[in-house]
Amino acid sequence: MSTYKLAAKFAASLYALALPLLSSNALAANGAVADEFKWMTFAVFGVIIAITMGITYWAAKHTHTTSEFYAAGRTVTGLQNGWAIAGDYLSAASFLGIAGLISLYGYDGFMYSVGWLVAYITVLLVIAEPCRNIGKYTLGDILAFRNDPKKTKTVAALSTITVSTFYLTAQMVGGGVLIKTLIGIDYEVSVIGVGILMLAYVVFGGMKATTWVQIVKAVLLVLASILLVIFTWAPYGFSLPDFLQAVVGDAKVQAQVAKLLGDAATNMSKEELGQRFLEPGLFLKSPIDQISLGMALVFGTAGMPHILMRFFTVPTAQDARKSVIWAMAIIGGFYVLTLFLGMGAAINVGPAKIALIDKGGNMAGPLLAQYVGGGADSVLGNLFLAFVAAVAFATIVAVVAGLVLAAASAMAHDIYVGVIRGDKATPKEQVTAARVASLIVGALAIYVGIAAKGQNVAHLVALAFAVAASGNLPAVFLTLYWKRTNTYGVILGMLVGAISAIALVMISPNMTYPQQVIKDAKKVLEGEPAQPAKEAVPAKPGEGFVCELFAVCKKAEAAKPATAEKPAKPGGAEKMAKMTEKLAATTDPADKTKLETDIGKLDKDIKKAEGDLKKFENDKTSMVGLDKPFFLLKNPGLLSIPLGFLCVIFGSLLFRDTRSEAMWDELYVRQHTGLHAEGALAH
């Protein structure tokens, strides 16, 4: 039976499976869409799925050879690849995570947008054209051109799978949260559904299906974002100063800032609180942390395997360069829009309500769409929400497909064909191996998506970028541009860079520390005792730069203002009783809505606190045995990236490799001229 007939049967069976699933008791009652409007969400999701499955059916008929499966036959134009790169790059973290972070933390959330856009300067200037000329399908191909093929492909494959797993986790979390919140399907079932669709694209359609799904998704995402921004910005006459002034003066934003600052907000006016939302420090409190995050985002893109793979789909190096230019224009425009999406969600929906639906803020964009369309009770509002959510869903599945293809390529092409079979596998065996590897990676993606429930997607993606920047980029960059680079340096740099990034994350504030969780839970349930007045405390210098990174000595402390005496804070049950009593007595619609939101949030906090106490009652330390963070930065890039470069240099100087030295001249000529580079297939 032909591949495209298998694809058609798979699509039909998937549809048959979906009907009872979507109407089953798995539907919960706590979604963002009222029951009477859920049919709209089903309908729009169905249209998106039908379009992408149609693309897969078409692509399956044109995917037979290894080059067609891995690189779409190298027939993608620069413009098409630019849109596909944007579709691959503008992930759930971009649309859901960044908009959510901006809506909750203001300026600090926008830092992610800036970092990810600037990253393409590195890709344009030093990566795109040489990689297209030298490589074939994978990161391992680039490194193996002048280094020992089996050794470098093995390490490159491990790194690719590691990075892709981090990134896959973020996308699967985003997909699960989105579907659960909108439709009410259990999170685990939602993740499985995303995984099945993604496998259909990759297994049957390969790179051709993945490319066109990414193009369609990118176009829809940009159009949806433009529409959202128009509706959000129009009430302010498209005036940026007026819009930002509305953000500063919004009571919901001011309340969010006061909550984040705690005691530091005691003597601040409402305007100062609002202004603070447009300044750094609410999420990334340390300037060093901001630098570390920026390094990971800027350098990580050039080491992301699924981005590097896109340069092998175009016929020439010039098209690779055009791809990056188009991608930068599309991505840059989109990231400007995220500022309005996040800020618009903050003033229209409110940080408290956004966090009530999803604590990571991932639903800010869809909730904003519902608001500007007329609200939760309107047909247009729910239709707009359904459209935006369906686009976000397509975003997740398209990016996941690209990641799975990258990881599967590493397993099949680098490990099976390159290492195990010694490049002697037939084309049919290679394609079969790629499809089997895709199934394995897809199953892994579903597993980690379920295991990582409740994490903010932009945060997880930043960690993936740190690993890529620390392990992959030093090896690729120095292989291309330093004559002394050899196999030993590449292996040492990739291993130490990636392992150090992961190890630093394991001892950082990103991990769960049970004693702190229990302490926070008890505050929610039992309240806090009265606090005496405190005098102002001047700033204290730290004991050195190392103290800002590791908990081995005293770090610098900012000045603390004087605070008045604080009364005792009631526990959750007492607070709930008072709020419920107040709700019953109020007649003002605005007050009633606010109280209902606050009660819902408090109820969620109480349930979480009770669950945390039960979950961690027997735990005293994190999974690596720490009771508090040892590494103080949220992102390890500041240390792990230089360490990766140093290890490539050190390993290359310490050991000699005659193959690496002998291949330098050929690599130099080929990366600059494209002589003997892989060409497009003739059709």
Where do the PLM segments sit?
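Membrane-embedded helix-loop-helix hairpins and adjacent transmembrane boundary segments
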Residues: 2-15, 20-683
